[in-house]
UniProtKB/Swiss-Prot annotation:
One of its GO terms (cellular component) is nuclear envelope. Keywords: Nucleus. It comes from Schizosaccharomyces pombe (strain 972 / ATCC 24843) (Fission yeast). The lineage of its organism: Eukaryota, Fungi, Dikarya, Ascomycota, Taphrinomycotina. It is found in: Nucleus. This is Meiotic chromosome segregation protein C17A2.07c. Disulfide bonds: none annotated. Residues 74-86 have a biased composition (Basic and acidic residues).
Length: 177
């Protein structure tokens, strides 16, 4: 059995390690210039909207960086402009809600089945069957609130509406009619 080499050798017999050593040498000699000689007026910031997006295993967080900068500026300015409602700067959407909706619909479909019908996997709704709309308001009392609505027709006479608010509570209601 052949031993594995830790570095890949190219056709020219340069290993990855050797190439990295060649690149690192000039990088170590680089120094950071003194930025005090530059004036702030020379630097132009782009006008595009900057949004930070990151996620962990439970939540997806979308943060509006421009709104955060505007909020910092409004705190430092006099209270004349403080009456304006700040922009929403944080929206949190939990991917666990998809699983909760799917589990609820699975229970609902199993409870509505007639005893003579066979239970197959084709009747279980997939998360793609949901229409998902996210709404948020910019008023100060609803800062960061996210509303998620899902509609799915289970049968001809039943439909489910699921509403969740990102701030405090979740409501689950079923309409049969």
């Amino acid at each position: 059995m052949a031993l594995k080499r830790s570095y890949y050798a190219s056709k020219d017999d340069y290993s990855t390690k050797r190439i990295l050593e060649i690149i690192e040498r000039p990088l170590k000699k680089l120094t950071i210039e003194d930025t005090s000689e530059y004036d702030d007026s020379d630097i132009e910031m782009p006008t595009c909207k900057r949004v930070a997006y990151y996620k962990n295993e439970y939540t997806i967080v979308v943060e509006d960086l421009d709104a955060e900068l505007e909020e910092d500026d409004s705190i430092n300015k006099p209270t004349e402009e403080a009456d304006e409602a700040p922009r929403t700067q944080l929206s949190v959407i939990s991917p666990l809600e998809k699983k909760l909706k799917r589990d609820f619909l699975f229970l609902l479909l199993n409870s509505n089945r007639q005893p003579g019908k066979s239970s197959g996997k084709s009747s279980i709704p997939s998360p793609d069957d949901f229409k998902l709309s996210v709404k948020y308001s910019s008023s100060s009392e609803d800062l960061g609130a996210v509303t998620i609505e899902s509609h799915l027709n289970v049968s001809s006479d039943a439909s489910i509406k699921y509403k969740s608010s990102g701030t405090s509570q979740s409501d689950l209601l079923m309409e049969i009619g």
